[in-house]
């Protein structure tokens, strides 16, 4: 059964989100008001190295006042390819440039009230190109063994849907890295550098 939109009006608009009220006709013919949000999409990336470690960030989320481990990611800029967003955000937040970025899946995290497609990508390793340029994002950046990342899910120490779904997708694939062939490497790819670095007073651990 499908709900039918019969018109909508914007009640709040900003560059971050739009809140609207729609007149919706239900399958039985009744018309109701339905509040919903449209927001930019997001791109999240699972960067997995040859030792099956995952690049993770430990950070605080202001709105929920929660600390947790997350995958790199961020909002997709207007007319930006989400794959470019995913690679850019990883580099800005961690100093690592992902290699061999490819799409895993796209989902809606709150489809009943929010239109904001979230795109999950997988990368085969990353090259250290400098320190993070987004120095307010993470308390700590770490290359985490895949089994430890799985334990984060079981223990509730991941607090964002993109991180949970990204890790579950990789775990469902057996943690396998794709072999060369049929994968487009991101511009600037080079030989992988050392994994143990310190950026702007924040720890990057291997």
From Swiss-Prot:
Superkingdom as given in the UniProt entry: Bacteria
Pathway: Antibiotic biosynthesis
Keywords, alphabetical: Antibiotic biosynthesis, Hydrolase, Magnesium, Metal-binding
Catalytic activity: CMP-5'-(N-acetyl-N-hydroxy-3-aminopropyl)phosphonate + H2O = 3-(N-acetyl-N-hydroxy)aminopropylphosphonate + CMP + H(+)
Cofactors, names only: Mg(2+)
Low complexity bias (residue ranges): 177-194
Family: Belongs to the Nudix hydrolase family.
Stated name of the protein: CMP-5'-(N-acetyl-N-hydroxy-3-aminopropyl)phosphonate hydrolase
Species in which this protein is naturally found: Streptomyces rubellomurinus (strain ATCC 31215)
């Amino acid at each position: 059964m499908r709900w039918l939109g019969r018109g909508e009006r914007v009640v709040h608009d900003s560059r971050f989100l739009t809140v609207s009220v729609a007149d919706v006709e239900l399958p039985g013919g009744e018309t109701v008001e339905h509040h919903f949000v449209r927001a930019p999409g997001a791109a999240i990336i699972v960067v997995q190295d040859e030792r099956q470690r995952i690049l993770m960030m430990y950070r605080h989320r202001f709105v929920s006042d929660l600390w947790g481990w997350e995958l790199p990611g961020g909002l997709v800029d207007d007319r930006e390819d989400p794959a470019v967003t995913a690679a850019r955000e990883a580099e800005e937040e961690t100093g690592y440039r992902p290699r061999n970025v490819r799409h895993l899946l796209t989902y809606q995290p709150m489809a009943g009230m929010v239109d904001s497609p979230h795109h999950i990508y997988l990368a085969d390793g990353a090259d250290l190109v400098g320190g993070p340029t987004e120095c307010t994002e993470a308390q700590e950046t770490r290359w985490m063994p895949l089994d430890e990342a799985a334990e984060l899910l079981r223990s509730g120490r991941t607090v964002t849907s993109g991180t949970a779904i990204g890790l579950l997708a990789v775990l469902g694939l057996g943690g396998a890295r794709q072999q060369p062939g049929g994968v487009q490497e991101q511009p600037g790819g080079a030989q992988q550098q050392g994994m143990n670095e310190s950026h702007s007073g924040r720890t990057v651990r291997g």
